[in-house]
Amino acid sequence: MKPERVDLRGVANVDELVGRVLQTRLREARTLTVGLELRDKQSLHDFRIACKRLRYALERFQVLEPSLEQIADRLALLQDALGEAHDRDMLLSILPPTMPATERRLQTERAELVERSSALWSELERMMQALDSHRT
């Protein structure tokens, strides 16, 4: 999935630039939260990549707005959980059919990791809303 292009036309100052970049990356991630509902490999992977882009943008600008660091740190935890779920998907795809107990364990772990990811995203949404209300 390609990143959404950030429209910087008419940007007059650093605050506007930061706002446009973060709004674009956040919109991209929010659009792909459907992966948390669908729970399929590709949708979760796309959501993870969008979260990574958002995190990198936050890290880039945290020198200007230190409160972004906490959100970036939480996004890293979300990425880790989604990455672990992806690892379970890969293991399940190569697991021999003669290992049903291992398959059940991996499926359970994956489901728990996706649930954790969903909870982390909900927490992140609250953090980002608080940041938005603080900035306006």
Task: Annotate each PLM feature.
Residues 1-136:
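Function-determining surface determinants
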